[in-house]
């Protein structure tokens, strides 16, 4: 089976993100519509219910480097969040986060955003004290 070229893959993800075909709990799209390399993306995650994240909207930046989707994107929270997989100073999602560490070409930005949302809802993380809403890194 041949590999889909990077730009075709990103165009598929862009279309899905823009048309809202994904789950309502996360969204993503190009940070700059003129970015012909489709490198810089924005993402949002709606905090999971029954957690300290409930009713919060988290903003993230996603950097799909030249080797994406063979290599994972770099993901950084813009909204302050307290999670073990997020650098508390920079907001960057650590490379040892299971989805990044075990990255597969079939994974998408949506996969990553949904897995981060699931991480927020785990018993160990859903009660973690969070910064005031609206704070940024």
UniProtKB/Swiss-Prot annotation:
SUPFAM superfamilies on file: UBC-like
Keywords carried by this UniProt record: Ligase, Phosphoprotein, Ubl conjugation pathway
Gene Ontology CC annotations of this record: cytoplasm; cytosol; fungal-type vacuole membrane; nucleus; ubiquitin conjugating enzyme complex
Highest taxon, organism lineage: Eukaryota
SMART domains in the record: UBCc
Any GO molecular function: ligase activity
Residues with the Phosphoserine modification: 71
Domain named UBC core: residues: 5-137
One BP term from GO: protein polyubiquitination
Family the UniProt entry places it in: Belongs to the ubiquitin-conjugating enzyme family.
More info: Present with 2760 molecules/cell in log phase SD medium.
Subunit structure: Heterodimer with UBC13.
Main function: Has a role in the DNA error-free postreplication repair (PRR) pathway. Lacks catalytic activity by itself. The UBC13/MMS2 heterodimer catalyzes the synthesis of non-canonical poly-ubiquitin chains that are linked through 'Lys-63'.
Protein name: Ubiquitin-conjugating enzyme variant MMS2
Organism of origin: Saccharomyces cerevisiae (strain ATCC 204508 / S288c)
The encoding gene: MMS2
